[in-house]
Amino acid sequence: MSSFLEFAKPKMLDIKRKINFASGEKTDESVQPQQQTEQSSAQQTTPSAKAVSNPFITPLTESTPGMSESWVELAPSRTSLCSSVDINMVIIDEKDKDSRLSPVSIAQSPHVEFESLEQVKYKLVREMLPPGKNTDWIWDWSSRPENTPPKTVRMVQYGSNLTTPPNSPEPELYQYLPCESDSLFNVRVVFGFLVTNIFSFVVGAAVGFAVCRKLIKHHRQ
């Protein structure tokens, strides 16, 4: 009996090895799907980790009723962009207005907005005169009220386009030109009237005499 067991022991060991090998293959096959499921779950979790790093994407929590877990991208809309652009334009316009309203000296900038015509006159006179001369008297003289005549005088004065036609002589020549008042009883008017009447009477009498003479001759024949 012992000899039989000793003889069969190697065979039994071989059978156990085969059984263990078969069971090991089964365990490997069962482990592989588990690894695949773990890899798929890891792949599913990686985009979530990437999404969390994006500040414009916020995940919906599981506490939201009636909705499954999803990702919503909060990109800036057109209305928000337009409103931001409008705000920037308003700020720029306000800055431009402030820069225009700020006082600007004549020496700093060539583009100066003068308040009145008197300041323009003063600046032109200062540019025309040589440096070093006092021009305060010119400013006082030009700013006096009597130097600016009223509108009625300016419209009636000679040389204005409102009173003289473009082809009229100069105002200085009026005193040398003969200018007389035209009336009905003037000597020239009466003389011309008489001369024209006498001439027309003579011409009419001559024409009438010629016509009458021809008629008389024709009647005698």
Swiss-Prot record:
Region annotated Disordered, chain positions: 24-55
Keyword Translocase: no
Post-translational modification: Ubiquitinated and degraded by the proteasome. Under oxidative stress conditions, ubiquitinated at Lys-26 in a pink-1 dependent manner. Colocalizes with pdr-1 and may be ubiquitinated by it.
UniProt cross-link Glycyl lysine isopeptide (Lys-Gly) (interchain with G-Cter in ubiquitin), position: K26
Chief location bin: mitochondrion
Record-annotated membrane-spanning stretches: 189-209
Gene Ontology molecular-function annotations: protease binding; protein homodimerization activity
Chain positions covered by the region annotation Required for initiation of apoptosis: 189-209
Quaternary structure and partners: Homodimer; via transmembrane domain. Interacts with ced-3 and ced-9.
Name of the protein this chain belongs to: NIP3 homolog
Source organism per UniProt: Caenorhabditis elegans
